[in-house]
Regions:
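Short loop-beta-helix segment that forms the pyridoxal 5′-phosphate
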Residues: 1-23, 37-39
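Residue-level preference for short coil/turn positions at secondary-structure junctions
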Residues: 6, 31, 77-78, 102, ...
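Short acidic capping loops at alpha-helix termini that bridge into adjacent secondary structure
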Residues: 8-9, 31-34, 159
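Structural signal for conserved beta-strand scaffold positions within catalytic alpha/beta enzyme cores
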Residues: 12, 58-60, 134-135
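Short glycine-biased active-site loop of nucleotidyltransferases that positions the nucleotide triphosphate
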Residues: 123-126
């Protein structure tokens, strides 16, 4: 809350993709509606769109920062929303993108998975969109193995998000145990990796589901794993 004092509400989830999935659902878009996003992205982003029975529409990126190219945004979009990604923590051109969404009356969703703490013209990334997804996965700025948050900046979306959020179950004991075991097992694996033992420890731990994977096989087939979405206490 101190990092984002302007936000209307913050909701915590078991993963960034859970936050994005529920945030998109709260927009209450008609089935099949299109959402604009850049093509260079993690598979979990278009999955969150598809899991809501919506359609991703991919756009090209700029070579210099791997972010969405605002100069090729469609002039007559049929889309209802746009997801802007701040790739590798480099802020996208929020001046052009925000103006575009306001002019075309599109919901603006920020993917802040890489960019917690970044700013664009002295304004924090995450404070531009109607909603913003943050990720606390094992490869993010703040890691809790799995975890995420949804910032709601549009006051009209607070109640829809809250209603959906309260209907979610908490993560199971077994899933939580997997995440708690991840740090000590990966620590042991790294210490013995040069002897090939660490690689075996990591492989067997994931194979036997003692620890979790960052991306699950079901997700690669655009299927929803049973433990997404979940809220945190």
């Amino acid at each position: 809350q101190q990092l984002f004092p302007q936000t209307q509400a913050i909701f915590l989830f078991n993963a960034g993709r859970s936050a994005l999935m529920l945030g998109i659902k709260a927009l209450n878009l008609p089935p099949g509606s299109k959402i604009l996003l850049q093509a260079f992205t993690c598979s979990t982003v278009p999955n969150a769109i598809l899991w809501n029975s919506l359609t991703p529409e991919y756009l090209d990126i700029q070579k210099e920062d791997f972010n969405l190219n605002p100069d090729i945004l469609p002039q007559n979009p049929v889309a209802k929303a746009l997801i802007v990604q701040h790739t590798f923590g480099q802020p996208a051109n929020m001046e052009k993108i925000t103006t575009y969404c306001q002019k075309k009356k599109l919901y603006l969703i920020e993917d802040g998975a890489h960019s917690l703490g970044a700013t664009y013209r002295e304004k924090k990334i995450g404070s531009f969109g109607d909603i913003t997804m943050l990720s606390f996965g094992r490869d993010k700025i703040i890691s809790s193995v799995f975890g995420g948050a949804l910032l709601v900046n549009n006051k009209n979306l607070v109640k829809p998000v809250e209603n959906l959020y309260q209907s979610l179950p908490y993560p199971s004991f077994s899933w939580t145990a997997q995440q708690l075991l991840h740090p000590p097992i990966t620590f042991l694996s790294k210490k013995t990796y040069s002897f090939y033992l660490g690689k075996l420890i990591l492989f067997l731990s994931q194979k036997t589901k003692i620890i979790s994977k960052a991306i699950y096989p079901k997700e690669r087939d655009q299927q929803t794993p049973p433990f997404f979405p979940r809220r945190l206490p």
